[in-house]
Amino acid sequence: MLPAVLRAEAEPALDYLLKQLVDFLGAEGHALREHDTPMSYYDYLCDIDHSVGYLWAAQVFAGYQLQELRAEVRAMWNHTGMIQAPMPKNKWKEIPVAQIYPAQKELIAYLRANNVDVWIVSASLEEVVRMVASDPEYGLSIPPERVIGVNLMLKKPNGDSTVGALERREGKKGIEYYFSKERMQWKLGTYPFAPLTWYAGKVAAILEWIDPSDRPILVAGDSPNDFYMQFYAAADQDAI
C-alpha cells in the first residue's frame, strides 16, 4: 500500500523504492495504513534507527527538478509559524521552520576574516542545503562546492546522469554554475552516492572531499549526528 500524499510526477523509481520499503516495514512489524505519508514512513524508519530514516529523507525528493526544489525551499523559508506535516488518519505533525541564527553568521564572518575556509557537512540532501547555504539571499554565502551532504544521482534532460559530488571532483565552482538555468533543469533520482553523510560518514566525507590528512581546526554541530565529526577535529590545534 503506497502513501496517499506523493507528487503525481514523482520519479517512477520512487514507486519501486516504496514497494520495497513497504515490504521492509511490514517485516519489521509495522501495520501500514492507507493514509500513510512520506513523513510517517520516515518516522517508522527512524523507529528502527535514524541511520535507516536519513536516506529516505533525501530519496523522497526523487522526481523533482532542481528549480522546482529551489522554489519549495523558498516557500518553506518564507513560511510563518509551524509547518503542518501530514500523518496517518488525518493527523498532523507540527515541525518548526528551519532558521539561521545570528551567531552562526557572526562565526562564519569571523572565520573568513581570519582566512579560514568554511565548509558545511550535513546529513540532509546536499542540493537542498546548498540552496540555502550558498544563496546570498539567506546571508551565509558558503561556496556551493563547499557544501557536502547526501548525494543522489542527477538526471540531465539529454538522459545523461551525474552526481553533485563528482562535480566537486571535476572542479566545478561558484553559484554561476551550481544555480545556472541549465543545471536547475536536472532531476533528482533515487540512487545514493557514497559516502553517506551521517554519523561516521561525516568524517568519511571530510577525508574524501576536503582533505585526506589535515583535520578541521573547528567543528560545530547540534546533535549526536555530529559527534564523530567533532571528535575528529584536530585537538592539537586547539580545535573545538
Question: Where do the language-model regions lie?
Answer:
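C-terminal cap/substrate-recognition subdomain and adjoining C-terminal extension
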Residues: 48, 55, 64-67, 71-240
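A metal-dependent, Asp-based hydrolase signature
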Residues: 2-95
